């Protein structure tokens, strides 16, 4: 997407214009979904005013009032002490639960795709073995394959009621005003699938203790099964980024993703010997 900010009569608006078919489909899907989803979500999310002809590519552009708040990097979240505030974890917990409470059947009617993680990760493994493992030190390559196999082999990892998920709940998609979360953006990956996946990017970006507090507010536990899933996803996401960099001939992105993958593998082994 190309996103630009515009000021009209003193109010700020966002104009998003897709460059490809996937982006066009995403905007059309969001236009159908977000108006209904916003009814049950306390935090501000994009509320489309209208769509119109897209001047730079397929589909339509969308226009909506700018969601209040600013995007902060992980260091700034920590410098402001936001991850230690109970209200931060509570706001995230309420948002996640509100999204999950939206009717999955209605989401299907609105065109939200379904995610079959067991099938997709099984298909990805062959490519990971062929293209990603050779870029890693031998021990790290074996560790990644081990994590992948453990995830796929545990039936309990796939025993869940499919729900609507944001699927990209990360610190840079939670907008902050002062010391509180005021909005959530980037619904481009929304899908029907494993509810645990909405903790994936918080696990890698905000840390285990923050995820534990989110789960406490949700009345749920952070047990060993969930920890293992989150550890796997944190590594698999970077491995798939490596594949993306290779497929699209983006050597810098590929190399950055390899470094991120190695760091994620190191964190997994560090956490597995810690107090969790």
Write out the residue ranges for each language-model feature.
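ATP-binding pocket architecture of kinase catalytic cores
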Residues: 1-116, 159
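Glycine-rich, phosphate-binding/catalytic loops in enzymes
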Residues: 32, 80-81, 183, 200-202, ...
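Short, hydrophobic secondary-structure boundary micro-motifs
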Residues: 46-47, 73-76, 107-112, 184, ...
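Helix-rich C-terminal or lid/interface subdomains of diverse kinases
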Residues: 189-192, 200-276
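Active-site acidic catalytic loop and adjacent metal/ATP-binding pocket
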Residues: 2-7, 15, 146-199
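An alpha-helical support segment within catalytic cores of ATP-dependent transferases
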Residues: 53-56, 68, 78-90, 101-167, ...
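Short helix-capping segments at alpha-helix termini
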Residues: 39-43, 139, 219-222
């Amino acid at each position: 997407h190309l996103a630009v900010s515009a000021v009209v009569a003193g109010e700020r608006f966002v104009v998003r214009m897709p460059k490809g078919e996937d982006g066009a489909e995403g905007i059309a899907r969001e236009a159908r979904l977000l108006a209904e989803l916003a009814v049950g979500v306390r935090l501000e999310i994009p509320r489309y005013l209208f769509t119109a002809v897209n001047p730079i590519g397929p589909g339509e552009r969308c226009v909506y009032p700018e969601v209040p708040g600013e995007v902060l990097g992980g260091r700034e979240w920590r410098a402001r002490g936001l991850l230690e505030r109970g209200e931060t974890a509570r706001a995230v917990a309420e948002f996640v639960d509100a999204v999950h409470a939206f009717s999955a059947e209605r989401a299907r009617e609105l065109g939200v795709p379904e995610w079959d993680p067991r099938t997709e990760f099984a298909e990805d493994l062959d490519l990971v073995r062929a293209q990603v493992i050779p870029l890693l030190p031998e021990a790290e390559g074996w560790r990644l394959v081990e994590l992948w196999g453990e995830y796929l082999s545990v039936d309990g990892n796939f025993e869940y009621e499919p729900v609507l998920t944001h699927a990209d709940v990360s610190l840079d998609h939670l907008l902050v005003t002062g010391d509180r979360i005021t909005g959530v953006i980037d619904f481009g990956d929304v899908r029907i699938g494993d509810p645990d996946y909405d903790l994936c990017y918080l696990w890698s970006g905000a840390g285990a203790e923050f995820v534990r507090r989110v789960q406490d507010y949700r009345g749920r536990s952070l047990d060993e099964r969930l920890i293992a899933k989150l550890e796997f996803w944190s590594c698999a996401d970077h491995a798939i980024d490596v594949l993306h960099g290779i497929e699209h001939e983006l050597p810098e992105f590929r190399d950055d993703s390899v470094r991120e993958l190695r760091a994620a593998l190191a964190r997994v082994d560090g956490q597995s010997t810690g107090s969790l």
